[in-house]
Amino acid sequence: MLDESPMRKGNSVSNDQGNPESNASVSIHQQNQIITCASPGPVCPNAIGIKRDIVVVRLRPVKSCPDYRFFRRVFETLEKWQLQVDMFSTSLGRITLALGAAALQAGIGDSCSARNDMMSRDLMHGMQKLLPDDHILELFPHMAIISVVGHPSRRIAGHIFATMDANDILTVMISHDAARLGIACVISEQHTAKALGVFEQCLFRYSLTH
C-alpha cells in the first residue's frame, strides 16, 4: 500500500537508553520535545512507511436507502472513476474511504486543486457528482497514512496506540491486517514528522534490547 513512501528501518537506530521494561513509561528528549513511550515489551517492527496527500471521505446513506444498495453504488462509483482506495472501513452502514488527493483531482477535473482547495465549495460539488445521490458526505483533507510493519505480536497494536495517545496524535482511521504483520493509521498530515519521530524512538530504539 505504501510502496512509494520513504521507509525508516529499525536497524538504523542505535540503542543507548537501557532496558525499557524497568518503567511503565519512558520519556525521551528529542529536538527540545519530550516523547512519552509506553513500555513496549518484545515488540520489534521492521519498518515505518508514510503516505501523504490523503483525503478521507466519510459517507452514510439517507434513511430511505438500504445499506446493501448504498454500498453497491459506492463501489460502482469507485470502479467508474477508477479511484484507488488506500484504506476502507465500514461501521453501522457508514463507509469511510482514504483516497489519494491526486486521484480525486483527476476524477473531479483540473479546475479544482484537491491539494490546496480541498474544503472549497467546488470540490464538494465535484465529490457530489462522483458519488451516489442518496448519501451524506463529509471530507477530511490534508491527511496522511502512517504504516508500521513488523512481526506478529499481540502487544504491538496496544503499544502503538498508547504511544500515540501519550503524544496527542489523533487517529481518523485504523487498519490491522489479518496476519497481524502491519498496522496503518490515518492521521493529520501536520503530525507526520512528530509521528515518525515518536514511532522511531518508542518502537525501534527500545525494542533493540530484546
From Swiss-Prot:
Biased segments, Polar residues type: 11-26
Domain of life: Eukaryota
One of the GO biological process terms: lysine biosynthetic process via diaminopimelate
UniProt-listed InterPro entries: ACT-like_dom_sf
GO molecular function, a single term: aspartate kinase activity
Region (Disordered), start-end ranges: 1-26
Record keywords, A-Z: Alkaloid metabolism
Family per similarity comment: Belongs to the aspartokinase family.
Function: Aspartokinase-like protein; part of the gene cluster that mediates the biosynthesis of loline alkaloids, potent insecticidal agents composed of a pyrrolizidine ring system and an uncommon ether bridge linking carbons 2 and 7. Lolines are structurally differentiated by the various modifications of the L-amino group and include norloline, loline, N-methylloline, N-acetylloline, N-acetylnorloline, and N-formylloline.
The protein, known as: Aspartate kinase-like protein lolA2
Organism: Epichloe uncinata
